[in-house]
């Protein structure tokens, strides 16, 4: 669904970002056999930073709370429902005039990639141990030092 905030903007740091009202993503995490694992989505090639892994997320709609936007995007991109997750803390990466909010969450029940319904923006999804991450979206990679301590 197109929103009036679906457009490119430039932040105070001179970076180009999608979402006039900012953006948000859902970072699902769990404890696996090798420690903390995160659920990442492989972005389709035609998308911004396509071919990299990151959180399901996107532009916020007008006056939309970050958690609501992250859940909406995770629903569109992976088929997740609000009842599938337990929301945790939020981490804001503020660039001046534009920000990305990462909403941390845990699965409400067992959740595997085969349980998800990917849309055209996603070409893959998987759980990854924090010490064995694939090629990451550069914005997500830059935020990892702040996010890691929040993951337990």
Stretches found by the model and what they are:
Residues 16-18, 22, 52, 56, ...:
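Catalytic phosphate/metal-binding cores of nucleic-acid and nucleotide-processing enzymes, i.e., regions
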Residues 25-28, 53-61:
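Short, flexible micro-motifs
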Residues 31-33, 44-46, 92-95:
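Short polar/acidic secondary-structure junctions
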Residues 37-38:
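Entry beta-strands of beta-propeller and related beta-repeat scaffolds
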Residues 47-51:
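A conserved beta-turn-beta hairpin within the catalytic core of GNAT-like acetyltransferases
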Residues 58-151:
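Unchanged
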